[in-house]
A protein has these predicted regions:
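Active-site-adjacent beta->alpha loops and helix N-cap segments on the catalytic face
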Residues: 12-13, 32-56, 70-75, 95-109
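N-terminal pre-domain/capping segments
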Residues: 1-24, 31
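Conserved, mostly hydrophobic/aromatic
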Residues: 18, 47, 83
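Ordered, amphipathic secondary-structure segments that act as subunit-interaction surfaces
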Residues: 78-102
Length: 109
């Protein structure tokens, strides 16, 4: 079994430190005090240009529950496109129904 070491980072300095310490990939987010939200596009671009390991980007439009209204899901779809265009190797996202189950319809989009 191969173990993949992922560093959760919120800045270019943290990304460099994780990469230099041997991480296999990064999860790039912002504001860990609220369990993370989507970072700005400029940060994603800077990390992708400076770091040689894959950077996965959290797409979470707001703190709080992972239950999203249809308009929030649509906005997150656009954010996914923006993060991929900025060079993200992958996307980290989650969504739940109001019953607490995985919102497969939202995640398929």
């Amino acid at each position: 079994m191969t173990v993949v070491v992922e560093g959760c980072v919120t800045s270019l300095a943290e990304a460099r430190e994780c990469a230099d310490s041997g991480a296999d990939r990064l999860e790039l987010c912002y504001d860990l005090d609220v369990d993370g939200v989507t970072p700005g596009t400029a940060l994603v671009e800077a990390v992708v240009q400076a770091i040689q390991i894959p950077a996965f980007v959290m797409v979470r439009s707001r703190p709080g529950p992972f239950v999203y209204a249809p308009d929030e899901v649509a906005a997150m779809e656009e954010t996914v496109r923006e993060m991929k265009a900025a060079g993200a190797a992958g996307i980290v996202v989650g969504a739940l129904t109001d019953r607490g189950t995985v919102d497969q319809e939202a995640l398929r989009r």
